[in-house]
Amino acid sequence: NLSTAVVCVAIMVVIIFVACPDYKILVMPVVALVIAGVLLITTVGYRGDRIDAWLHPETSDSGYQTMQSLYAIGSGGLFGKGLGQSIQKLGFLPESHNDMIFAIICEELGLFGALCVIALFVMLIVQLRYIANHARDRYGALVVTGVMTHIAVQMIINIGVVTNVIPNTGVPLPFISYGGTSLAFLMVEMGFVLSVSRQMLPYEAPTKEELQMQQ
């Protein structure tokens, strides 16, 4: 399951960097991962087919789902067809309730609705970063950082696949895609975040001396 591996590696890399912010530590592992990824794509046939479907979805049989997703996004326009009025979800777009749910959001709610969904994710990620920065100890900060990275990377991959920015891979949209297992794990992660947030350090306003030093 390459998509899950990518998410896990991204979480690992971010946590390592936050725990020990030294670029030199990450250079070799990142280079090794890039080389391994290129080898996997070039040596395994079906992964090459996915790349071809990504670059030329209109001429590839494997690009059917991508094309239907783009049709859904394009037909939504600025404000969409209306909630529940999607045509593509009626058997035209595979996995419309799961990995491709963002395309249905674009079709029913338009560009405005899609931007609202993205804005909600950004607000959540910003709040998670705030909690991580004000955690009482390093362990809590790293836990929240891992949750933040998980949600951010999964959202970016899902929206990237739906809009054909990156090759098609099966990653659900956090909190929105159908799937009990994914939602259950996300709820557990948010429970960890709430536990850390209850023990956050109190906010202390900067003193006049600190403000003068910053200026």
Features from the language model and the residues they span:
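Hydrophobic alpha-helical segments of membrane proteins
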Residues: 2, 6, 80, 114-119, ...
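Hydrophobic alpha-helical segments of polytopic membrane proteins
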Residues: 2-42
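Alpha-helical transmembrane segments of multipass membrane proteins
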Residues: 11, 35-36, 40, 153, ...
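Structural signal for the C-terminal ends of transmembrane alpha-helices
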Residues: 13-22, 122-132, 193-201
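Hydrophobic, glycine- and aromatic-enriched re-entrant/interface helices and adjoining loop segments
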Residues: 25-116, 135-143
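Membrane-proximal intracellular helices of multi-pass ion channels
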Residues: 115, 126-128, 132-140, 145, ...
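Loop-to-helix entry and N-terminal half of a specific, functionally important transmembrane alpha helix
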Residues: 132-170, 176
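A juxtamembrane structural motif centered on a specific transmembrane helix
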Residues: 157-215
